[in-house]
Amino acid sequence: MLNSDRIKWNRKYRSRREVFSAHPSDIVCNFYHLAPHGCALDIAAGNGRNALFLVQKGFSVEVLDISEAGLKMVAGRDPKVRAACVDLDVYDIVPRRYSLVLNIRYLNRRLFPQICEALIGGGVLIFETYLKHPNFVPQRPHRDDHLLRINELLLGFLKLEVVYYSEKMAAAFGEPYPMASLVAIKR
């Protein structure tokens, strides 16, 4: 990721104009319980809303993000959260370490195989991000490489046992947006 991305996200997290939810993602609330307790990884954690929820549920959590400003919102709030400011375009995820991996509203296809390897046996992946849909024109444009293609998320994690998958409209940025959601277990 470019330094410009770090600057952009730091600016967004420091701005009072941008409002980021403090509530955990619905998909995390609905499926975290499938994972054995242990260490969770929150990729592109932003303000840490999902990590803080998981700590309340008994997990220790490692959070990764490009933005120091975003990580400051979660770092130090609980000793079970460890934050690391990293460039996910070059960072390598530790293999066979996590009982739960979250990837919410972020896409880096290079990480797909690493995410599979990061899970311990019985570990759970919860992944949800934006989807390019031919019948939808967003109010806020996204770069095509930041959008999943139809069925791409499902096909990207065939090594795991998929327990939930959907492609549907969901709320994002105050408007409906096509999202792909996946929950899968490493057997």
Feature-to-residue mapping (PLM):
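Conserved class I S-adenosyl-L-methionine
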Residues: 1-35, 38-46
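Conserved SAM-binding loop
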Residues: 74-75
